[in-house]
């Protein structure tokens, strides 16, 4: 159980960077990835939620109830934005500390990834070369058929389709063959990488003290994050109180109005 937190942290910090070995891009920091994902996700929820609220208020029932949900929604999004700004430096510090504490382990894993990449790169290059050759052959076979279609009449469309079908099937079968060959070539290296990662964690378990030290430091960082986040969360709670109270008053007023109309009938 002690290894769970460390495993998740290391996989998050190194695993999502592994793709940059294949793409040769500059990796984002862990905090940048979290921040970008959270921003996109929250903004999407905010925008779609506001659209639903606006649609409801524009409906006959929404106009009759007059709950002013859109005003409350804007207040909520403003409150959440403020809390997100307050938590930004706190979470940034947490990720910086966590990356610092796991730096040596991440370096070892990145070294393993680089070694495996160098071994499998020739197979990837060969696969790409064969794929380009297959595409060129397919284009050469299809080009005359396209010329026939341009010169022919509508009745030749079916004839053209009949000629294209076996070519497409041949292309599909050849592509599957190349993919299967690549899979078989890469399988040993994939197993080797898994074994290396497993060996790293076994060394940590055998070390005992190192694993306990990583766990203790990560737990300490989480506790510090919780303590520093308390003021922002309290601000969030205080900001929600008037919004919820306003919504409660609007609902009670709508119910009261509906009751009066029913009694009048």
Curated annotation (Swiss-Prot):
Keywords: Cholesterol metabolism, Glycoprotein, HDL, Lipid metabolism, Lipid transport, Lipoprotein, Oxidation, Palmitate, Phosphoprotein, Repeat, Secreted, Signal, Steroid metabolism, Sterol metabolism, Transport
Subcellular location: Secreted
Pfam families: Apolipoprotein
GO biological process: acylglycerol homeostasis; cholesterol efflux; cholesterol metabolic process; lipoprotein metabolic process; phospholipid efflux; positive regulation of cholesterol efflux; positive regulation of phagocytosis; positive regulation of phospholipid efflux
GO cellular component, one term: extracellular vesicle
Record InterPro entries: ApoA_E, Apolipoprotein_A1/A4/E
Sequence repeat start and end residues: 67-88, 89-110, 111-121, 122-142, 144-165, 166-187, 188-209, 210-230, 231-241, 242-265
Chain positions covered by the region annotation 10 X approximate tandem repeats: 67-265
Its job: Participates in the reverse transport of cholesterol from tissues to the liver for excretion by promoting cholesterol efflux from tissues and by acting as a cofactor for the lecithin cholesterol acyltransferase (LCAT). As part of the SPAP complex, activates spermatozoa motility.
Protein name as catalogued: Apolipoprotein A-I
Organism: Tursiops truncatus (Atlantic bottle-nosed dolphin)
Organism ancestry: Eukaryota, Metazoa, Chordata, Craniata, Vertebrata
């Amino acid at each position: 159980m002690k290894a769970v937190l460390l495993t998740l942290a290391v996989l998050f910090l190194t695993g999502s960077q592994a793709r940059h070995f294949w793409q040769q891009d500059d990796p984002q920091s862990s905090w940048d990835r979290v921040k970008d994902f959270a921003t996109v996700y929250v903004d999407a929820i905010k925008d779609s939620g506001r659209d639903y609220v606006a649609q409801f208020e524009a409906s006959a029932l929404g106009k009759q109830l007059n709950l002013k949900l859109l005003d409350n929604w804007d207040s909520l999004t403003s409150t959440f934005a403020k809390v997100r700004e307050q938590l930004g430096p706190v979470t940034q510090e947490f990720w910086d500390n966590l990356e610092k504490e796991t730096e040596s382990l991440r370096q070892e894993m990145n070294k393993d990834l680089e070694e495996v990449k160098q071994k499998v790169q020739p197979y990837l290059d060969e696969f790409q070369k064969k794929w380009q050759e297959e595409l060129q052959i397919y284009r050469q076979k299809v080009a005359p058929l396209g010329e026939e279609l341009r010169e022919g009449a509508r009745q030749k469309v079916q004839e053209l389709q009949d000629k294209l079908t076996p070519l497409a099937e041949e292309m599909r079968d050849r592509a599957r063959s190349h993919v299967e060959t690549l899979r078989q070539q890469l399988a040993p290296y994939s197993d080797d990488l898994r074994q290396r990662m497993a060996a790293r964690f076994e060394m940590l378990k055998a070390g005992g003290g190192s694993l306990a030290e990583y766990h203790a430091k990560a737990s300490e960082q989480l506790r510090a994050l919780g303590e520093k986040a308390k003021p922002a969360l309290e601000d969030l709670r205080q900001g929600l109180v008037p919004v919820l109270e306003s919504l409660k008053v609007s609902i009670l007023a709508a119910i009261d109005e509906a009751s009066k109309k029913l009694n009048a009938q």
